[in-house]
Amino acid sequence: MAKHLGKKIAPIPMSTDISVVDLIDNYFTAYNSARLREASQLLACDILKDGVTVGVSLSGAMTPAGFGVSALAPLIRNGFIDWMISTGANLYHDMHYGLGFELFAGNPFLDDVKLREEGTIRIYDIIFGYDVLLETDAFIRKILQAEPFQKRMGTAEFHYLLGKYVREVEKQLGVKHSCLLATAYEYGVPIYTSSPGDSSIGMNVAALALEGSQLILDPAIDVNETAAIAYNAREGEGKSAAVILGGGSPKNFLLQTQPQIHEVLGLEERGHDFFVQFTDARPDTGGLSGATPAEAVSWGKIDPDELPSTIVCYTDSTIALPLVTAYVLNQCPPRPLKRLYDRREELYDKLRTDYLAAKDKPVEKVATNGEVATYPCGTPIRQ
């Protein structure tokens, strides 16, 4: 039994002046509280170091609850998030705060028919006026008519421009705490969305297309830029971390950077070094949201040698994010900003150059003199 023993569970009564670090380190002793503790400590001790590139995926209705302003923006300011994948809905509802609109605590058991008649929108226990949607839509359509948007672009550039305009509104209105989009713009953190048409932002882009807008959001740009970020993360002694809030398409878009590198582009890559997920999704239904780090190893998304550095905490992200944010803000000094948005073209060109060079090599290595035949990425071909 001795080899399985961890830290002894020695409970002591809580004090009236307990800190969040003390709470997590000493009272989150088992089950998913222990997983949250392990995730917090892994972030503080290993992930949030200068040589690690941290990608965060965001799904679920997190920004309507204010977490874009209260948690994600501070993490960006401290250099703890280098790039992001988000649902479009999270970025859309984040804009409400930047534009000075109001959202309120409500009740999940309100009469939704009456709410519709009153012009009130409900997101579980959050409520706000229908006019918030209309005014946000009007703002989006107005700025998307500007010249910088009249071209083909990826979603990182698109969100950077959105954040720029939202930040100007924040300044004019005197908004005290910037929203996620505006903060990412200021700190050079690229934000991608894996499904740009699947939100009110994309719906407004589509409406303007009917009017002749030249804006085209190109998913190929996003796939290659995100792969380039992951590819560059391993330069020198660097490492790559995937921190996943929820699951869904953003989770896959963050993790698929590795198969894009080795499976599709034929470049050598071993997977992300760190994997931390907060989710309420089960693994046994086969969906990506609940897929475990061990399963991701089979796809080449996670380095098998780094499985001990992977943690899944089964909990609501609205519980985990504020706790973990408070923990790392207390435990970790700010990191230098990577400003990966400003380096997109440089990283893209490096990936493209290496890919084209690899393409000139034989499609697969033929085994001779006892050698093992391999695929272009170096994976052995099993007979």
UniProtKB/Swiss-Prot annotation:
Protein keywords: Transferase
GO cellular component terms, A-Z: cytoplasm
PANTHER family: DEOXYHYPUSINE SYNTHASE (PTHR11703), DEOXYHYPUSINE SYNTHASE-LIKE PROTEIN (PTHR11703:SF2)
Protein species of origin: Nostoc sp. (strain PCC 7120 / SAG 25.82 / UTEX 2576)
GO molecular function, a single term: deoxyhypusine synthase activity
Lineage: Bacteria, Bacillati, Cyanobacteriota, Cyanophyceae, Nostocales
InterPro entries documented for this protein: Deoxyhypusine_synthase, Deoxyhypusine_synthase-like, Deoxyhypusine_synthase_sf, DHS-like_NAD/FAD-binding_dom
EC number: 2.5.-.-
Top-rank taxon, per record: Bacteria
Keyword Transferase appears in the UniProt entry: yes
Similarity-based family: Belongs to the deoxyhypusine synthase family.
Spans traversing the lipid bilayer: none
The protein's name: Deoxyhypusine synthase-like protein
UniProt cross-references to Gene3D superfamilies, sorted A to Z: Deoxyhypusine synthase (3.40.910.10)
